[in-house]
Amino acid sequence: MRVSQAQALENRRRAVAAASRLFRERGVNGISVADLMKSIGLTTGGFYKQFPSKEALVAEAAQASFGDLDLLLASFDTTHGDHDTARSALVDFYLSTEHRDQPGTGCPTAGFAGDMAREPTAGEVRDTYAAGVREFAAWMSTDADDGLPSVATLVGAILLARATAGTELSEKLLESTHKALTAPHGPRPGILETGAERQGPDAT
């Protein structure tokens, strides 16, 4: 039976939405085209009527995932009024056990990181990912920096917390990183002191 144009567009939307979730949850190589299409009640043949390759779907799914992230960040701004408060609330969410335990609906910066690190060559997917990281960093930026240190810290922490899920270390990673990112700005004790200053004024 011939599928209408409207139904074809809906099938494509569902495939991209499912891929966006499953790729973040299982990794690009952790889900086959057949299993992806089965999850939305469609056939593999239907996939190739919509996409030239799995790589094309990965690029579209990554773009859709970062679009969802943009909407999430905008909602934090709307809900919390001023950007500093919104940024703090985002850190609270990002370093939560809820975010750790639900990668399929979580941040694509972390969700696609492993696959992007294994990408052998530059291309549309990597360009999409890099653009998403830059936009996330811009949202996290402050007068003190461009947001990249915060994004790197958040993503690294959530990846490690997921990798150690079920252990005490996982919880500690989330808590310690949250404490570090929300501490008042300023030099940490001992970091910028000279050896003599640490030993006290009577040091010789």
Predicted regions and their residues:
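Helix-turn-helix
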Residues: 14, 22-56, 60
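N-terminal intrinsically disordered/low-complexity leader segments
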Residues: 1-10, 187-204
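Hydrophobic alpha-helical connector segments
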Residues: 60, 74-106
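Short alpha-helical scaffolding segments that buttress acidic/His motifs in well-ordered protein cores
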Residues: 90, 94, 109-113, 150-157
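Short, basic, alpha-helical segments at the C-terminal edge of helix-turn-helix-like DNA-binding modules
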Residues: 63-69
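Hydrophobic/aromatic-rich alpha-helical bundle segments in the mid-to-C-terminal region
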Residues: 120-134, 140-193, 204
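Amphipathic alpha-helical segments used for helix-helix packing
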Residues: 86-89, 100-130
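Short amphipathic alpha-helix in the helical subdomain of ABC transporter nucleotide-binding domains
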Residues: 8, 83, 87, 146-150
